[in-house]
Amino acid sequence: MDNLIGKLVVVETQETTYTGKLSEIGEDDVHLETEMGWIVIPMERVALIREKED
């Protein structure tokens, strides 16, 4: 998944789908830069991370 860092991605959780620029993937968190600001998503909530299609 490190190949997605710096790219526009979709991060899906059970509750929400986030779209933004992937900044960092750690053992505990995913850091995403969105239009609304920075979002930190706990890894245990992440169901899927994929590159956003045009």
Task: Report residues per predicted region.
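Conserved RNA-binding domains used in RNP assembly and mRNA/RNA metabolism
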Residues: M1-D54
